[in-house]
Amino acid sequence: MATYAIVKTGGKQYKVAAGDVVKVEKLDSEPGASVSLPVALVVDGANVTSKADDLAKVAVTAEVLEHTKGPKIRIHKFKNKTGYHKRQGHRQQLTVLKVTGIK
């Protein structure tokens, strides 16, 4: 069974293994830079590590590949019989990471 970790970034949790490519909310790092991600859980075969003392020894490193944008979402507010309507759009800024190792 392969080793994987649950990492927290941008208010979300992601399941990652070494070599995975993950899109996360924008990080303030340049492409090509190495970042360390905070770990919530590590599974290594039958061993599950979730204690804070043990997780302090674990590091998940990733390389920033690029910054990109997510798909456009459209928000439309409408109130019946008053003529009120409002349109708004949003594209989330994302960072593409490649996980280089779980140590």
Curated annotation (Swiss-Prot):
Name of a matching Pfam family: Ribosomal_L21p
Keyword Ribonucleoprotein listed: yes
Cellular component, GO annotation: cytoplasm; ribonucleoprotein complex; ribosome
Keywords: Ribonucleoprotein, Ribosomal protein, RNA-binding, rRNA-binding
Any one GO biological process: translation
A molecular function GO annotation: rRNA binding
UniProt protein name: Large ribosomal subunit protein bL21
UniProt xrefs under NCBIfam families: L21
Similarity remark: Belongs to the bacterial ribosomal protein bL21 family.
Protein task: This protein binds to 23S rRNA in the presence of protein L20.
Quaternary context: Part of the 50S ribosomal subunit. Contacts protein L20.
Organism encoding this protein: Mycolicibacterium smegmatis (strain ATCC 700084 / mc(2)155)
Classification via HAMAP family: Ribosomal_bL21 (MF_01363)
